[in-house]
Amino acid sequence: MLCLPGQINLQIPPNVIQGTGSVVTVAKDGTVSRGPANIGNIAPAIFTRKGDGTGAPAATASKNGQVFDILVANNDGTPVALDAGNYVSLFGTGFRFLSGPATITLGGTNIIPLFVGPQGQFAGLDQINFQIPLSLAGKGDADLVITLDAKTSNLVKMKIK
């Protein structure tokens, strides 16, 4: 769990029953806050450089699919231009328990991901990997969303050379 002014990050245990519930927090001074929570297996959210769910994704890219050392976002949250054919690893949450096919839509083109699941190093962090189709060369600005079990993520921005 992480608590900051105006933000609480927590991981829901996998054995929690799905449905509507509530989250209750108690501050050091005893102040109690409550809020609704809709618990489900899939709730795809792509992390972004700005940290607010908008702009370029918190992601890395690779020319060969092996070494992911190309940043996908500038410090201000705008997208870095990537080559068509690059591999991309997006990070987020709410991906790992999908029961059906996953789709990435980038610049209006549907892409089947190469991998969807737990990132493997950090609790609750999920990842989805894909290759930018060569058909998107020269596209420029491109919107990206992922769809898992008929649920769609937040829209993020990418740029294709």
Q: Language-model segments: what does each one mean?
A:
Residues 1-161:
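A sequence-level detector for low-complexity, Ser/Thr- and acidic-rich stretches
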